[in-house]
Amino acid sequence: MNSIYGILGQDLNIYKGTNMEPNPIYSLIKGGLNTFSKNMASYYGQYSIRINTIISGGIEGHIAGSKNKQSSKFKSNYSKKTFLKRLAKPQEIARGVVFLSLDKSSYITGSNLVIDAGWSAT
């Protein structure tokens, strides 16, 4: 699982008025995951093992690593950045994971499937 912060810099405005703070190390780790998955795909392809990642936008629910839910201010700030004006439901991200596990995606490897309601296109 990856994040749009692995392909774009963080938008600090989405944290304004919330108790959340941006974490620059998070972007570094997620960007590294993009490259790592491509390198793994280039090696393991010879064994017919496919390696892909999901790059998700914000997901409705709890804050990662916390029992706290996202504040309404964060959801409002975040939603303004997406074409669909909302965060993803967990099952919407899960559908991408399922797709990549199916035979219908058997020729896909080394890819980062972006599921972000258009955030990365802005």
Language-model features, listed with the residues they occupy:
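Conserved SDR Rossmann-fold cofactor-binding beta-strand/turn motif
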Residues: N2, R50-E60, S101, V114-D116
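A glycine/serine/threonine-rich, flexible loop-to-helix segment
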Residues: L12-K16, Q46, T53-T82, T122
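Short, small/polar-rich loop/turn modules that mediate ligand/substrate recognition or access, typified
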Residues: G45-R50, I108-G110
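Catalytic loop of short-chain dehydrogenase/reductase
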Residues: M1-G32, S37-Q46, G58-E60
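Generic structural signal for alpha-helix termini and adjacent loop/cap motifs
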Residues: D11, N39, K85, L102-S106
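A conserved structural motif in NAD(P)-dependent oxidoreductases
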Residues: T82-I93, K104
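Short C-terminal tail/terminal secondary-structure segment
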Residues: N13, V98, T109-T122
